[in-house]
Amino acid sequence: AMVTTSKGTLIAAADQRNTHWSDWGNIDTVVRRSTDNGLTWEEPIDVIDLKSQSYFNGTQSAYTIDPALIAEGENGKNPGRVWMLVDMMPESTNGSQGTYSIKETGTGYVKVDGKDYLALYDKDNNQYTLRENGEVFDKENRKTDYVVKQFEGNDKQGYHEKGDLYQSGKYVGNIYLRSASKNNDSAPLHPKQTCYLWLSYSDDDGMTWSEPVDITP
């Protein structure tokens, strides 16, 4: 994807496949900027770089793929803002065959008191919901001691820790990782194994990007 901003900067967004050409695995969403109409390009900027398992061998990674860009004009609601829409997959092999292929249906969200919340599940398939400020509630609508990491301001590391789960302040894994081999970094709670739609934006011509927001429901 490529757009020209209201200031004349070219921004190109792409999948950075770090290990192989397939549509799964360790894939980051990156952008490059040009301020001279494409004659030269700056170094890639990581927008989203989700976690992989320590035993990654081609598939054991959460990832984002297929970014789309829209640039607002100076007379837009958010003058000069650049929006990015991207598909997000928890640890999986996309729609391909295999144990961790994307095969669950639905949005991955449930309604609580009229609001949509991301559903999380434990190993016994008990349902939880991810609420405001990263708080996690159980099926009986009781707040638990689980909290998902929140970010303040823009993160220059591609939101690598997005999805990190803490229990009583202790890190217990990442909700977007799921496989259970030795030394895994999977959290005890995880969302449905389906595709999600994330939205991010930049207000400085693509130099920094907001924390992606899941707009799936």
Predicted feature descriptions by range:
Residues 1-217:
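Asp-box/BNR beta-propeller blade signature and adjacent active/binding-site loops
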